[in-house]
Amino acid sequence: MNAPGTFTLGPGDGSARTARLTTAHGEIETPVFMPVGTQGTVKSLCPTDLQDIKARIILGNTYHLYLRPGDELVAKLGGLHRFMGWDGPILTDSGGFQVFSLSGLRRITEEGVTFASHIDGSKHLFSPEKVVSIQRNLGSDIMMVLDECVPYGADRAYTEKSLGLTTRWARRCRKAHPAGDRGQLMFGIVQGGFFKDLRAQSAEQIIEVGFDGYALGGLSVGESRAEMYDILGDAAPLLPADRPRYLMGVGAPRDLLAGMAAGIDMFDCVLPTRNARNGTLFTFQGKVNIKRAEYREDDSPLDPTCPCYACRTFSRAYLRHLYIAKELLSYRLNTLHNLTFFSIMMERARQAIREGRFAAYRAEMEALYPEGE
């Protein structure tokens, strides 16, 4: 296996591209969607389930794992991979997005961000050095720098000031974790809100610091699709072509397709798992709201083309019954199915890019998932 951080480009189609990223726990074929395992678990699934659906990498959350059970405990017990029984690659976010989502419970300074725990109200400081230390304890394959995710609608003055802070924090993160240390990769994050020149400025500054990969943050925060695609189309090409590009927090099928078309390699989002728990399921015939009365006597499989256990074994009527009855099995089967759909969708996208027919594949999927879905 190549050294961690090796990024080998494969065939492309327009700006869409395939590649292979090597980490300490294996290689990842891109473009890739990363299921979110917030607290050391993808809700309702076992690691063997993730292997069965061919999940190539999962995401863990620094904020939640720091508060409970604690990063030092995880380190003492052998690191996050051993703790959760997953031997594939793991990316951990910096926890910044969760902290900034606390709004009134946090305060930003040059040193970092002070916040109150959502669990018990205790006060904590996330500095760049602290989030790096936490992620080193967790032992993730890819760690993210601390950044400020600017809220949608922030004015230019605030966005520009925040951009400078994010850059200074990125430098401190890099200093706290030198390139190549422990085989753990570190990705920088480009901010700049919805100002194209500030996005370009942020990209230049973050690239100058030097990271193993680069992420676009601050999108899918309340803006319209048109606004997101406009920024995405301009910002993605600013990121180095020879390093992985990561679009954070974006997961609707047509948004993944737009990201791939712009040259993005990695995506994460709670959408497929959260929607599963809400009874909204993705199929290759379109979206299914399993709680609808029309499925009460429907003996057909959820998706006859899907190889997941739920589709091979149960009817739509049974899946509806489980959901209406609030049975725990509903969450498990629905999650298993949705993540299988996303895994297959990305595999088909990679194949379409390799074969030079990505535009046709994108149009086919967008017809199934029109604007607003």
From Swiss-Prot:
- Matches recorded under InterPro entries: ArchSynthase1/Queuine_TRR (IPR050076), TGT (IPR004803), TGT-like_sf (IPR036511), tRNA_ribo_trans-like (IPR002616)
Keyword Transferase part of the UniProt annotation: yes
What are the BP-aspect GO terms? queuosine biosynthetic process; tRNA wobble guanine modification; tRNA-guanine transglycosylation
Q: Which SUPFAM superfamilies match?
A: tRNA-guanine transglycosylase
Record keywords = Glycosyltransferase, Metal-binding, Queuosine biosynthesis, Transferase, tRNA processing, Zinc
Q: Which residues are listed for substrate binding in this entry? A: 93-97, 147, 191, 218
Q: Which domain of life is it from?
A: Bacteria
- Report the active site residues: 93, 268
UniProt KW Zinc keyword: yes
Q: Name one GO cellular component term.
A: cytosol
* Pathway where it operates: tRNA modification; tRNA-queuosine biosynthesis
According to the UniProt record, what class of enzyme is this?
transferase
Region span, RNA binding: 249-255, 273-277
Give the cofactors, semicolon-separated.
Zn(2+)
Q: Where does Zn(2+) bind?
A: 306, 308, 311, 337
Co-factor remark: Binds 1 zinc ion per subunit.
- Enzyme Commission number: 2.4.2.29
Give GO MF terms, alphabetically.
metal ion binding; tRNA-guanosine(34) queuine transglycosylase activity
Q: Which reaction does it catalyse?
A: 7-aminomethyl-7-carbaguanine + guanosine(34) in tRNA = 7-aminomethyl-7-carbaguanosine(34) in tRNA + guanine
Protein family membership: Belongs to the queuine tRNA-ribosyltransferase family.
Assembly, in brief, is: Homodimer. Within each dimer, one monomer is responsible for RNA recognition and catalysis, while the other monomer binds to the replacement base PreQ1.
HAMAP family named among the record's database cross-references: Q_tRNA_Tgt
Functionally, this protein is described as follows: Catalyzes the base-exchange of a guanine (G) residue with the queuine precursor 7-aminomethyl-7-deazaguanine (PreQ1) at position 34 (anticodon wobble position) in tRNAs with GU(N) anticodons (tRNA-Asp, -Asn, -His and -Tyr). Catalysis occurs through a double-displacement mechanism. The nucleophile active site attacks the C1' of nucleotide 34 to detach the guanine base from the RNA, forming a covalent enzyme-RNA intermediate. The proton acceptor active site deprotonates the incoming PreQ1, allowing a nucleophilic attack on the C1' of the ribose to form the product.
The protein in question is named: Queuine tRNA-ribosyltransferase
Q: Which gene specifies this protein's sequence?
A: tgt
